[in-house]
């Protein structure tokens, strides 16, 4: 008997059911690699970032995640080179899918009990996705921006439901806008730390810190005449 199609598990109807010591015998997910490409390139090299965002609340199987990753990676390797991008899968298939196997051969009514004891056995895994949650993210150079968007458009056909391709205004995978990143870089306030940067804070006395300069004023020494 084959596996039940993933369309039977598309809707989120029950609570999360992760793998645990009570839920054993779970098959391994099909997707095993979540970062592809030049994943060790510093944050300065890939300023452009684009996301594939889910527009439905649904379950996405591990097979669909692997198919989308392969489709996006194959297109980017062809047009941007294997060192010209960084692809990251942003969701993980932790939810376990169950199936109550039913016999369909002749004489099956004597072997099975219908819906009595219908708690099924694990048959696969999927990711629980919310509306507006990012599925895939690609960072690259600005000259490969069109290729990154086309790669995500091709990967979109591997997923159920509706998705949108959204170009991020931030610098790469960081949380800072391009203007802030370039400004802090000229001021030597931001340092590359792998994929993400490290923002250096102000040090020293409180009066020398820029965020507090507007509130901390130098002390005024009153003369003896005014005190008297």
Swiss-Prot record:
Quaternary structure and interacting proteins, as annotated: Component of the small ribosomal subunit. Mature ribosomes consist of a small (40S) and a large (60S) subunit. The 40S subunit contains about 33 different proteins and 1 molecule of RNA (18S). The 60S subunit contains about 49 different proteins and 3 molecules of RNA (25S, 5.8S and 5S).
Q: Which GO terms describe its molecular function?
A: structural constituent of ribosome
Is DNA repair given among the entry's keywords?
no
User: Coiled-coil intervals in this record?
Assistant: none
Q: Which UniProt keywords apply?
A: Ribonucleoprotein, Ribosomal protein
- Name of this chain's protein: Large ribosomal subunit protein uL16
Is-annotated flag, keyword Ribonucleoprotein?
Answer: yes
Phylogenetic placement of the source organism: Eukaryota, Viridiplantae, Streptophyta, Embryophyta, Tracheophyta
**Cellular component per GO, a single term:** ribonucleoprotein complex
Checking CDD domains in the record gives: Ribosomal_L16_L10e
